[in-house]
Amino acid sequence: MTTVDATAGESGRPVAEEAPAAPVVGPMAGDPSIWGLASFIAGSVALGLALVGVVPFGVLGAPLAIILAATALGLLLSTIWAAAVGQSAVAAVFGIFGTFWLSYAVLVLGLDHNWFAIPVLAAVATVRLFLLTWLIIIVLLTLATLRLPSAFTAVFALVSLALLLLLLAWEQTSPLGVPSSSLLKAGGWVVLVFAAVGVYLFFSAAQAGTGGKALPLGPALMK
């Protein structure tokens, strides 16, 4: 749209100027990270508490209701929102974590109900495969996003550390297939730490989304 300047130009004709664009509202606007981060925090807290012993040891399905219905679903919907508003990096991060949480739920349910016809003796190797695959993916994500503020890098690095500890726990299984409880608990505490960093990121996004000033997120490690 254009508006007509009240003053005339050198030719004596009105001068057309660009009017400021109207703010975009509706589903094609906003910050999807507010919802995405809240979803991420919910699943992280549930998994971390389960790993440190809030529920009986070995009850892997305890956090699944939150992980599947809140975290995985929330992150995947946030991915669509981010892609719709052109935030490709945010969409990639939420998409990666959304599919991670979804695949965790499928893994636990699949092993418990024998969906994939995996022999009992191969169940431990299947869990190791899952953890190693996602460790590689999250390490790659960490390295590929070093231009993001360092608070995001800290989350990705802590997720990688948690996956490494859980992988080591399953590498040290007993003859009965029981993983190392101490390493599982260590991994659980790391999960709670990256959930806490996620809370900080959520507050930053919420502050900005409600008209305030975003919290400092630290300098990027790569310019």
Predicted regions, residues:
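Short, highly charged, low-complexity non-transmembrane loops/tails of multi-pass membrane proteins
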Residues: 212-223
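Membrane helical hairpin/interfacial module
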Residues: 75-101, 106
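Juxtamembrane loop-transmembrane helix junctions in multi-pass integral membrane proteins
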Residues: 24-31, 55-62, 84-88, 118-125, ...
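Structural signature of hydrophobic alpha-helical transmembrane segments
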Residues: 58-72, 120-133, 156, 188-192
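N-terminal topogenic module of multi-pass integral membrane proteins
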Residues: 1-82, 88
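Alpha-helical membrane segments in multi-pass integral membrane proteins
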Residues: 127-140, 150-174, 180-204
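C-terminal ends of transmembrane helices
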Residues: 75-85, 139-147, 205
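C-terminal halves and exits of single transmembrane alpha-helices
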Residues: 98-124
